[in-house]
Amino acid sequence: MLIFEFCAENLTFIDKAIAAGAGRIELCDNLAVGGTTPSLGVIQEAIKLTEEKSVDLCVIIRPRGGDFVYTDLEVQAMLADIRAAKEIGVSSFVLGALTSDRKLDQRVMQLLLAACGEAEVVFHMAFDELAHTDQLEAI
């Protein structure tokens, strides 16, 4: 089944995207830097909009723009964002983490995936930063 996904910056255009046939909304903030984690208030309102239209919602977990190599402090912030988002009803996340040599950061990904629990997880554009030979292994 083909799913049309719309990447929404905050609440802007979610209604129009759904009306145009989007089957899933990827919610983020700061698209100019590739997307960052939106506020809890924005997430709550997006949940209301998507639930009433029976459209899936995925929330990006990314503490900042730039690369996908995160400090321990940033990882802790990501874990806190996942926990908080789950508490208000998020069941699908978009995330990813790499090492400084552009490999999948296994340690960080294990922490993030464990925090997500049973939630659906989509690996974001960090995947494109992996060497082609590493992409298959990462899957």
Segments predicted by a language model, with ranges:
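Hydrophobic faces of well-ordered beta-strands that scaffold small-molecule active sites
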Residues: L2-A8, I25-L27, V55-I61, F93-L95, ...
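Short, flexible N-terminal segments of the mature chain
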Residues: G21-A22, D29-A32
